[in-house]
Amino acid sequence: MAGERAQNLQDTFLNHVRKNKIPLTIFLVNGVKLQGVVTWFDNFCVLLRRDGHSQLVYKHAISTIMPGHPVQLFEPDETAEKA
C-alpha cells in the first residue's frame, strides 16, 4: 500500500454518487430535505445540483444522505458468502 492514499468511506461514497450522477436525498440536522446530484465535494462541503440550480451544503449541517437507488461501493467478499 506504499504510495497509495487510503480513502475514507465518506469520500468513496460521495465520489461514487458524483461519478454515476446518482440522485440523492439529503436531510439536514434542522430537518430540511434537499434533493439533487452531487457535482463537487471537499472536506467541508458538498455542491448539490437540481433543476439547473446549485446549493453549497456544509457537511456539518448534514444528518443523513439517501441515494435514489442502492449503491455497491465494494466487491462482495467471497469468504463472507461461504459462511
UniProtKB/Swiss-Prot annotation:
PROSITE patterns with a match to the protein in the record: SM
Gene Ontology biological process terms, A to Z: regulation of DNA-templated transcription; regulation of RNA stability; regulation of translation, ncRNA-mediated
Pfam families registered for this protein in UniProt: Hfq
InterPro entries named in the record: Hfq (IPR005001), LSM_dom_sf (IPR010920), Sm (IPR047575)
Domain of life: Bacteria
Molecular function terms from GO: RNA binding
Keyword RNA-binding: yes
Keyword flag RNA-binding: yes
Keywords: RNA-binding, Stress response
The family this protein is said to belong to: Belongs to the Hfq family.
PANTHER family for the chain: RNA-BINDING PROTEIN HFQ (PTHR34772:SF1)
Protein purpose: RNA chaperone that binds small regulatory RNA (sRNAs) and mRNAs to facilitate mRNA translational regulation in response to envelope stress, environmental stress and changes in metabolite concentrations. Also binds with high specificity to tRNAs.
Name listed for the protein in its UniProt record: RNA-binding protein Hfq
Lineage of producing organism: Bacteria, Pseudomonadati, Pseudomonadota, Alphaproteobacteria, Hyphomicrobiales
